[in-house]
Amino acid sequence: YNTYYYDRFYLPGQELKKHCDRAACEISISIHVSSNIEEHWPIYIKTPDVYTVNSKSSKQKTFSGIEKKGDVVGVMLNPGDGVLYKGCERPHWRERMPGTFEMMKEGAEQLYYHQIFFHYVLQDGIRAHHAWDECN
């Protein structure tokens, strides 16, 4: 079931602190809508699940846009891309957004990163009573 969605604009220097989501966010999808920053700004997910593809050699390659460091996966999203994850189980975060905050100087373009989060619970799961959540 769907629970709620959240629309957010990040500005330079803002971050998403490391956390696990509340019960209404059993399954989460984070979608990068648009941005005007020049570098990738990954969302990090701590997870033992490593999504890889086998190459012809004995090495494994990670999918494009995914960076793995130990048990942390950094996912770089282009506008229109999304990532699906278990929000209640997997700690996730973003480091400080790059860039400097322009104090609305005339003619200055404000850097931003626009993201929408969609949250769900399993229909027959232990969190199903959070369907159509009204807390947000």
Q: Could you tell me what each predicted segment is?
A:
Residues 1-6:
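A short coil-to-beta-strand element that immediately follows conserved catalytic motifs
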Residues 12-89, 112-116, 125-135:
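Catalytic core of non-heme Fe(II) oxygenases with the double-stranded beta-helix
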Residues 16-19, 91-107:
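Short beta-strand His + acidic residue motifs that chelate non-heme Fe in jelly-roll/DSBH
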Residues 119:
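An acidic, glycine-/histidine-flanked metal-binding catalytic module
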